[in-house]
A protein has these predicted regions:
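His/Glu-rich zincin catalytic helix
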Residues: 1-81, 189-299, 415-424
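Short, flexible, solvent-exposed loop/turn segments with mixed acidic/basic and small polar residues
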Residues: 92-96, 189-196, 311-316, 404-409
Length: 424
C-alpha cells in the first residue's frame, strides 16, 4: 500500500491494487462515525460500440444497456436482492449510471466488513434470467417516460440534441423505450463479461475505517474469485464536428416560468492548457460573470428580469462546452443580454485572487464531507485517469494572464439556445 500525499492540505489517499488488477483508493476521516464505499465500472451510456483484441468488427448494443445492467445487477442468485441484504445491516445502497461510468454505492455506520464484502460480491456476481430481464423492462420503461415529463430532463437533453451532431450525449442515459424493450440477456452478459472486470473497475472508500483492514478484506475477497483475462475493449466514438444541430429550439413543458439554456461548443485545440487546468479556469471565469456574486446576476435580479441564472462547462474528448442556464419570465429580453455578456467576459486580478482563496478554502473543507470527496476521487479517475496531488499548487499558481488568454480564445460561433415554455 502506498500513500498519495495531497500537498499543501494535510491529507492523504491510501492506494493499493489487488492481484487481479482492482485498484483501491481510501481516504480516512476520523472525525466522522460512518463510511461511504463506491465500486465503479468504467462503462457508461455512451459506450454502445466496442471491440476486444483480435476482433475485426465492433459490437453494437442498444442505447441504455449500461443503465439496464445497473438495474438488474441488484438481483442475487438465491432469488433475493442486494437491497434486502443491506437493509438487514441497516445500510443504505444505491447505484447510478452516467455517460462515462456506472457506480454502486454503500453508506453505513457499522458492519464494515460485511458491507464491503457484499458490495464486491453482488456487483461482481451477475444473475441474468429472461424472466428478470422482462420484469425489469417494465420498470425502466416507466422511468424513461417519467424522465421525459421532467422539465429539467427536457431542457438538458433538448440542448444536447440541439448542440451535438454525432456525440452520443444526444441520447438518453436510459435509452428510449424501444431500446429498453429490445435489450437482451445476451447483450447484458456481453457487456458484463467485457467491462465488469477488476482491471476496468475501481473501489473508493472514505470515512472512519482502518485502511489496512479494508485492503485485507478486499484482497481476500478477490483472491477467492476467478476472472477471465481482461480483453481491453476499444470503445468507438464518432468525432464531433463543429457547428450545431439546431440554433434555436422551443419545447413545451410543465413549467410556470420559462427556462433557457444557451450553450456554446468549441474545439479544445483552441486552448493551450491541459484539461484539468482549463476546467478550473473556465469555472472561475463563468462564476465571476454569471455566479451567485456576479454583477450581472445582481443586476438581473434587482430588475426582476430573472428568477435565477448560472453557468457551467464541460470538457470531453476534444470538445469544450459552456452552458448558461436561466429561469426568466422575459426570455426575449434576457437572452440578448446574456449573449452580449458572453462577448465581454471579464476577470481582473482582484477577482482572481478572491476566487483562488475561495477555491483553496473549499479544497480543504470539502475533505470533511466523505460523500463529496469520494465522488471527487471517482470523477478524477474517470475524467483524468489519475488523482492530482498538487491541486493546492495548481490553484496557487493561477494567474490573470492565462485567464485572459483563455477568455480571448473562447469561440462563440457554434451556439444553440433552447427555450422551455409552459404548455399552451
Amino acid at each position: 500500500m502506498r500513500e498519495i500525499v495531497l500537498k499543501g492540505i494535510d491529507e492523504k489517499i491510501y492506494y493499493d491494487v489487488c492481484d487481479n488488477g482492482l485498484p483501491i483508493y481510501m481516504l480516512v476521516n476520523e472525525k466522522v462515525n460512518n463510511f461511504y464505499m463506491t465500486l465503479s465500472v468504467k462503462y457508461g451510456s455512451i459506450d454502445t460500440e466496442f471491440k476486444c483484441k483480435g476482433e475485426s468488427e465492433y459490437t453494437r448494443v442498444h442505447d441504455g444497456v449500461a443503465h439496464f445492467l445497473e438495474h438488474v445487477n441488484f438481483n442475487e442468485p438465491d432469488g433475493s436482492t442486494a437491497h434486502e441484504y443491506f437493509d438487514k445491516l441497516g445500510s443504505s445502497i444505491n447505484a447510478f449510471t452516467t455517460f462515462d461510468f456506472t457506480c454502486y454505492e454503500v453508506f453505513a455506520y457499522t458492519e464494515f466488513e460485511k458491507n464491503l464484502n457484499h458490495l464486491l460480491d453482488y456487483v461482481q456476481t451477475p444473475y441474468f434470467t429472461k424472466e428478470l430481464i422482462e420484469k425489469e423492462k417494465g420498470i425502466i420503461c416507466e422511468e424513461v417516460k417519467m424522465g421525459k415529463n421532467n422539465p429539467g430532463h427536457k431542457l438538458y437533453y433538448g440542448m444536447n440534441k440541439a448542440l451535438y451532431k454525432k456525440d452520443k450525449r444526444r441520447n438518453l442515459v436510459t435509452g428510449e423505450v424501444e431500446d429498453v424493450k429490445g435489450t437482451t440477456v445476451k447483450e447484458l452478459q456481453s457487456v458484463f463479461d467485457t467491462f465488469y472486470h477488476p482491471e476496468n473497475m475501481f473501489l473508493v472508500i472514505t470515512g472512519n475505517f482502518n485502511p489496512d483492514v479494508a485492503v485485507g478484506i478486499v484482497k481476500e475477497n478477490q483472491a477467492k474469485k476467478t476472472f477471465s483475462k481482461y480483453l481491453a475493449p476499444v470503445k468507438k466514438f464518432d468525432k464531433e464536428p463543429m457547428g450545431v444541430n439546431e440554433e434555436y429550439l422551443e419545447i413545451e413543458a410543465n413549467v410556470e416560468i420559462p427556462k433557457v439554456k444557451i450553450s456554446y461548443k468549441m474545439p479544445m485545440s483552441l486552448f493551450s492548457y491541459d484539461k484539468r487546468l482549463l476546467n478550473i479556469y473556465l469555472s472561475i471565469i463563468l462564476r465571476n460573470n454569471f455566479g451567485a456574486t456576479s454583477y450581472l446576476r445582481e443586476e438581473l435580479l434587482e430588475k426582476e428580469l430573472v428568477v435565477g441564472i448560472g453557468a457551467n462547462r464541460d470538457i470531453f474528448n476534444d470538445v469544450v462546452t459552456i452552458d448558461i442556464n436561466i429561469e426568466t419570465k422575459y426570455p426575449s429580453e434576457v437572452i440578448p443580454i446574456v449573449k452580449e455578456k458572453m462577448k465581454n467576459l471579464v476577470l481582473n486580478e482582484d477577482d482572481l485572487k478572491r476566487r483562488i482563496r475561495c477555491n483553496i478554502a473549499a479544497l480543504i473543507n470539502d475533505f470533511d464531507d466523505i460523500e463529496y470527496v469520494n465522488t471527487d476521487i471517482a470523477d478524477q479517475l474517470v475524467t483524468h485517469g489519475d488523482i492530482a496531488d498538487n491541486m493546492y499548487e495548481i490553484y496557487s499558481n493561477l494567474n490573470i494572464n492565462e485567464a485572459n488568454d483563455i477568455i480571448s480564445k473562447i469561440d462563440l460561433s457554434n451556439s444553440s439556445t433552447v427555450l422551455l415554455v409552459p404548455f399552451k
